[in-house]
UniProtKB/Swiss-Prot annotation:
NCBIfam families in the record: PRK11653.1 (NF008655)
Family affiliation: Belongs to the UPF0441 family.
Biased composition (Low complexity): 177-193, 209-223
HAMAP family xrefs: UPF0441 (MF_01188)
Coiled coil region boundaries: none
Region of interest called Disordered, as start-end residue ranges on this chain: 165-223
Protein name stated in the entry: UPF0441 protein KPN78578_33850
Lineage of origin: Bacteria, Pseudomonadati, Pseudomonadota, Gammaproteobacteria, Enterobacterales
Pfam family, one: DUF1190
InterPro entries: Biofilm_formation_YgiB (IPR009576)
Amino acid sequence: MKRTKNINHSSFRKSWSARHLTPVALAVTAVFMLAGCEKSDETVSLYQNADDCSAANPGKAAECTTAYTNAVKEAERTAPKYATREDCVAEFGEGQCQQTPAQAGVAPENQAQAQSSGSFWMPLMAGYMMGRLMGGGMAQQQPLFSSKNPASPAYGQYTDASGKSYGAAQPGRTMNVPKTAMAPKPATTTTVTRGGFGESVAKQSTMQRSAAGSTSSSRSMGG
């Protein structure tokens, strides 16, 4: 009987300790989770061309040129493609589109749409995001596009190939972005209908505002 009582008392003590330590453990876990989230962000700079990058990074002209060249190649691979110049101009504005050779990855039915000219139309690269130039290593880069058509949701903004906005189309800025923002985007395999890219930008902007609102609400409740 005495042994049984001792076991019960021990269980009670363990239960009491667990109940009182759990909030502390949760608090510590939350701190580490927040730290992990902060570390998931990456500081990037927005440039219009290699010269802008070189001016901001003295002695790194070669790295800046390479990053710009890679961004241009990435833009050709991932930018929205249009079957006609008119469709592209309607989205991005006059003087903001260029022809690009038909890609092997584009579906045959879409290649047929551009058979008359033998090429597709895509927006010019308006700028690019570049990660920090760490000693010796090459920085990541991501091409950015911008519309000059006031009717487009992408008007005056920097957007990536997926339609995600990174604010006003003003080079020289530095900002924090999720590391996923710098990940390579999938190659464009189909042509976009007129206004299609703008719809993607509008949807992405709505999602970003919703996420920002949820974060602010959570912080207010936590604070």
